[in-house]
A protein has these predicted regions:
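Hydrophobic/aromatic-rich alpha-helical bundle segments in the mid-to-C-terminal region
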Residues: 91-95, 104, 108, 122-166, ...
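Helix-turn-helix
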Residues: 3-41, 45
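Amphipathic alpha-helical packing segments from all-alpha helical-bundle domains
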Residues: 52-55, 74, 82-85, 100-135, ...
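Alpha-helical DNA-contacting segments of helix-turn-helix folds
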Residues: 8, 36, 41-50, 93, ...
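Helix-loop "lid/cap" segments that line or gate small-molecule binding pockets
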Residues: 61, 77-84, 93-98, 164-169
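Hydrophobic alpha-helical connector segments
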Residues: 45, 59-85, 137
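Short hydrophobic clusters on alpha-helical segments that form packing/core surfaces
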Residues: 3-8, 50, 79, 141
Length: 175
């Protein structure tokens, strides 16, 4: 896995192949196939691992926060700081690689898991449609992620996105 991640970050995700990963890892291609059926399998596994790490990071940030609005605010800020400081680069690099529908479903579940730590704070705030709120939060943070990765001022993006989401959640909790 480390070999594939290094290749993706150093040479680009398009260079992640059975041959390059096996060579970098010091394995024969036959040995590689004992672990993964294809290069897209290793790409999907790398993305899933990255998202699981990201999710654990976010869960840790909000674990002991008792104020639900503060938990949401910290989650948004932390998720975008993670992007701004470059820890999201591997997932970004790998996202351009074509993967199977099953692999996409696994990655989609990992993305949704990242948002789960917000379910309880949203419920505590009286948000009725938690799924809608999570979808809106995801959309806003994804937009900010794209802007940060395109060179926008990360401090401003984080602050504006956090304020936008907190205000939006406040509105949802009143409706």
């Amino acid at each position: 896995m480390d070999a594939a991640a290094s290749i993706a970050l150093e040479d680009g995700a398009h260079r992640v192949s059975v041959a390059t990963v096996a060579t970098r890892a010091g394995l024969s291609r036959t040995s590689f196939y004992e672990y993964f059926a294809s290069s897209s399998d290793i790409v999907a596994e790398l993305i899933t691992e990255e998202l699981e790490s990201f999710s654990a990071f976010l869960e840790e940030k909000v674990r002991d926060v008792t104020d639900p609005s503060q938990a949401i605010s910290i989650w948004v800020s932390s998720s975008l700081e993670y992007v701004a400081d470059g820890r999201h680069l591997l997932a970004k690099a790998l996202s351009a690689i074509e993967i199977s529908r099953d692999q996409s479903a696994v990655i989609g579940m990992a993305h949704r898991k990242m948002l789960l730590s917000l379910s309880e704070p949203l419920a505590q705030l009286g948000v009725v449609d938690i799924a809608q709120a999570l979808s809106l939060i995801h959309s806003a943070t994804q937009s900010a992620t794209t802007r940060i990765e395109s060179g926008a001022d990360s401090v401003r993006e984080i602050e504006n996105t956090r304020n936008f989401i907190v205000a939006g959640i406040s509105t949802l909790s009143r409706s």
